[in-house]
């Protein structure tokens, strides 16, 4: 019976832009550089150029600062941008990435059929980038008592290896620079934020027991998250720089009974 079925759908989507209009002088704020005419969420990092297949060194594109403090690429005689294996021989530069999602919103569904109800809330974000500090912390070049990410198995091992993970050298902090675009990750995600399934018992049935209403339900929160990398939760940090030691909200499942006399 179609008259017993109801479906309510609510779609929400939002986006926003920002621009710094006044500032005494530009300055670096963490992974960003604030300057007039730019967004405060534009990433300003070391630009990486892959891994040297001969040595396993992390390579960086070379930039230098002009008279206005802006980073400009350094070119060789052939017009190609120079690279270096020493991050101290270059400057940070804008990567062209922002931590602001292109679209942020939710999809709410509410179904009812006779005594059954089902409510589902999905949240999502499309676009934007996040500097994955947790991942960077597990891609170190070798520190005693620290865990590694499985991607460390892709590290350079011998001349000729083509990989984006530099060689391992215990204690050499110069091989891994967290403030580099190597650890920029797509912040797109979708999450099954909440789902609730319930049943309202028939009035005639429950009146036999002296009840006015009887409802049984099961509810789940933070049930599923899909993001670019397992464990990465871009939902709660608009700056795109989660500290790496934070915890995402736990998955909660609860069973309930509402009784009205």
Please describe what each predicted stretch is.
Residues 13-19, 113-115, 124-128, 194, ...:
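Transmembrane beta-strands of outer-membrane beta-barrel pores
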Residues 1-99:
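Conserved small-residue
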Residues 8, 19-34, 127-156, 226-234:
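Outer-membrane beta-barrel and related beta-rich outer-membrane complex signature
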């Amino acid at each position: 019976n179609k008259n017993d079925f109801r479906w309510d759908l609510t779609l929400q989507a939002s986006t926003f832009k920002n621009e710094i209009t006044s500032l005494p002088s530009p300055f670096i704020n963490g992974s960003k550089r604030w300057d007039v005419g730019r967004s405060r969420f534009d990433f300003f990092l070391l630009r990486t150029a892959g891994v040297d297949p001969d040595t396993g060194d992390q390579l960086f594109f070379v930039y230098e600062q002009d008279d206005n403090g802006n980073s400009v690429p350094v070119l060789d005689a052939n017009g190609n941008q120079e690279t270096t294996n020493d991050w101290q021989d270059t400057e940070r530069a804008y990567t062209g990435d922002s931590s602001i999602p292109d679209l942020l919103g939710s999809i709410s569904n509410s179904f009812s059929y006779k005594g059954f109800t089902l409510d589902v809330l999905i949240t999502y974000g499309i676009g934007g980038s996040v500097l994955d500090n947790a991942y960077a912390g597990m891609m170190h070049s070798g520190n005693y008592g620290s865990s590694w990410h499985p991607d460390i198995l892709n590290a350079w091992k011998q001349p000729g290896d083509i990989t984006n993970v530099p060689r391992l050298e215990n204690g050499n902090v110069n091989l891994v620079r967290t403030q580099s675009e190597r650890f920029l990750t797509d912040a797109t995600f979708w999450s099954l934020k909440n789902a609730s399934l319930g049943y309202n018992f028939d009035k005639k049935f429950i009146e036999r027991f002296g009840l006015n209403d009887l409802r049984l339900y099961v509810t789940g929160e933070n049930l599923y998250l899909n993001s670019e990398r397992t464990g990465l939760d871009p939902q709660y940090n608009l700056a795109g720089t989660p500290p790496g030691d934070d915890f995402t909200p736990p998955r909660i499942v609860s069973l309930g009974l509402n009784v009205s006399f």
